[in-house]
Amino acid sequence: MEKYLIVGLGNPGSNYAKTRHNAGFMVINEICNKLNLFLDNSKFNGMFAKTIYNNCVVFFCQPTTYMNLSGEFVSKMLKFYDIPIKNLIVIYDDVDTKLGVIKLRKKGSSGGQNGIKNIINLLKTEEIKRIRVGIGKDPHAKLDQYVLSNFKIDELVIIKPAIIKGALAALEAIGEDFDKVMNKFN
């Protein structure tokens, strides 16, 4: 059976749970709610749920390191469970994408996002499938303060459908041609 590692990026702790930077965690939580899974397994500074989905063994994960160290968890999980990089999908927030929009890519640079940057550096490849959740940006705020701020109430109405759509895209990508999934969701 093929194995997949689906990783949502964010920062651990309840004080970060509703921040923009935790959009990746929010997508993983949405998937787990949809599939009635619990992130109750712990390994390599991360939490994960393991299940069979679309005839594949799938690990839905949230690193418990801070965002900029996410690659340590990802590289150890890939190696330990013998998961090929082609079956890695990383989900994270993107300030360069409009609030509420998701974008799927098969490869590319980090775009300045420190979590995916660390993963790219440790895996030594930019050929990593990803789902970027648009959080937009505030031209009047410092970037670090903005990404670590909670979504405003009126923004939650916009981001929630994107979280659901990101979860559906991740699930559809398991065992399927990623180009086909990109065409559907982009």
Curated annotation (Swiss-Prot):
Instruction: Read off the InterPro entries from this record.
Output: Pept_tRNA_hydro, Pept_tRNA_hydro_CS, Pept_tRNA_hydro_sf
Locate the active site.
Answer: 21
Report if keyword Hydrolase is assigned: yes
Name the Enzyme Commission number(s) assigned to this protein.
3.1.1.29
What UniProt keywords are attached to this protein's entry?
A: Cytoplasm, Hydrolase, RNA-binding, tRNA-binding
Q: Name one GO cellular component term.
A: cytoplasm
Q: Where is it localised?
A: Cytoplasm
Which positions bind tRNA? 16, 66, 68, 114
Task: Spell out the SUPFAM superfamilies in the cross-references.
Answer: Peptidyl-tRNA hydrolase-like
First-tier enzyme category under EC: hydrolase
Superkingdom to which the source organism belongs: Bacteria
The residue range of the signal peptide is none
Pfam families given for it?
Pept_tRNA_hydro
Q: Where is this site: Stabilizes the basic form of H active site to accept a proton?
A: 93
For this protein, the record's HAMAP family field holds: Pept_tRNA_hydro_bact
Q: What does this protein do?
A: Hydrolyzes ribosome-free peptidyl-tRNAs (with 1 or more amino acids incorporated), which drop off the ribosome during protein synthesis, or as a result of ribosome stalling.
Q: Which NCBIfam families match?
A: pth
The similarity comment for this entry is: Belongs to the PTH family.
Description of how the protein assembles with itself and partners: Monomer.
Q: What is this protein called?
A: Peptidyl-tRNA hydrolase
Provenance organism: Ureaplasma urealyticum serovar 10 (strain ATCC 33699 / Western)
